[in-house]
Amino acid sequence: MAQVFKVAVLPGDGIGPEVMAEALRVLDAVEAKYDVKFERTHANVGGAGIDIEGKALPETTVNICKAADAILFGSVGGPKWESLPPDEQPERGALLPLRKIFGLYANLRPAIIFPSLTGASSLKEEVIAGGFNVLVIRELTGGIYFAQPKGIEGEGRDRVGFDTMRYSVPEIERITHVAFQAARKRGKKVCSIDKANVLSSSVLWREVVTGIAKEYPDVELSHMYVDNAAMQLVRWPKQFDVILCENMFGDILSDEAAMLTGSLGMLPSASLAEGTFGMYEPSGGSAPDIAGQGIANPIAQILSMGMMLKFSFGMVDAADAIDNAVATVLDQGFRTRDIYQQKDGEKLVNTKEMGDAIIAAL
């Protein structure tokens, strides 16, 4: 009897529904190829949640997610909702509460450049020849984004804005284990990012990470200040395997690493809780400027679905098959507009045609 997994499908706004449709078609192909069944329940989130149910994260959506084994998330946001109070806007009103409700503390963002796409990168060919594969692991529920106190006080020109950067030993320990366990399955290197020369929270971070590293003698640990890391990512990204960051540093460096690949439309992400539950989403935004035109790149959404198979459902072979199918399609020259360079052998395709090609390769 086929194993059954429950998936909460949250397409969201902008290009979200279009790229989600292709990911679900690839999921159909996985069902046909492997002895497994995916029960999918769609729910509103972000701007769609605001328009249809009055808030970015409706209670119905939360309940659907609670009943699921994983969340497959599209993208949220757009100009239509930018005039709302910040806490009610799609991004802050949906993503931050989802992370808190489900304890999604570990964000995994691969920054991969395929050898056939090195020309799309902003870096020189000699720096990235042969491609690179970096995994940024970001602590997602602590640090300056969440710690108290924070706020704005006073009147007029006497107003003061303040935030608190705070980390506990258990918070640092659990994200460090995620990084070292990931490195064991990759290049066996962890570079921990901090600002221990000026921040007390970073002093503790470095101390705890160094202690945990002793449990993983087969993995090489290095430390790097965040300003140097930002420079080194551009100078020589191949030096990195797994990059371990606290929340704000990871937010910044993961975007930088992503852009080195040439397109955010290529990059998946996973946000994991303790256990097997996770939320999987593309690294890019809702791209409202191209929504509805059928030209969005669905690869990030499809690879995010592949990460769901690997991390929440233990289907490593299926996840690898999806990764290989994407690489095959790129080697065959299929390109959506964002990665099209008008080179010989390239074939410009739309969203659905890219999905068709990946399904055929799978």
Curated annotation (Swiss-Prot):
This is 3-isopropylmalate dehydrogenase. NAD(+) binds at residues 78-91, 285-297. Substrate binds at R99, R109, R138, D227. PROSITE patterns: IDH_IMDH (PS00470). It comes from the Bacteria. It is found in: Cytoplasm. InterPro entries: IsoCit/isopropylmalate_DH_CS, IsoPropMal-DH-like_dom, Isopropylmalate_DH. GO terms for molecular function: 3-isopropylmalate dehydrogenase activity; magnesium ion binding; NAD binding. It catalyses: (2R,3S)-3-isopropylmalate + NAD(+) = 4-methyl-2-oxopentanoate + CO2 + NADH. Its main location: cytoplasm. The record marks Y145, K195 as: Important for catalysis. Pathway: Amino-acid biosynthesis; L-leucine biosynthesis; L-leucine from 3-methyl-2-oxobutanoate: step 3/4. SMART domains: Iso_dh. The gene is leuB. Keywords: Amino-acid biosynthesis, Branched-chain amino acid biosynthesis, Cytoplasm, Leucine biosynthesis, Magnesium, Manganese, Metal-binding, NAD, Oxidoreductase. Its EC number is 1.1.1.85. GO terms for cellular component: cytosol. Pfam families: Iso_dh. Its cofactor is Mg(2+); Mn(2+). Catalyzes the oxidation of 3-carboxy-2-hydroxy-4-methylpentanoate (3-isopropylmalate) to 3-carboxy-4-methyl-2-oxopentanoate. The product decarboxylates to 4-methyl-2 oxopentanoate. Belongs to the isocitrate and isopropylmalate dehydrogenases family. LeuB type 1 subfamily. Binds 1 Mg(2+) or Mn(2+) ion per subunit. Homodimer. Mg(2+) binds at D227, D251, D255. GO terms for biological process: L-leucine biosynthetic process. HAMAP family: LeuB_type1.
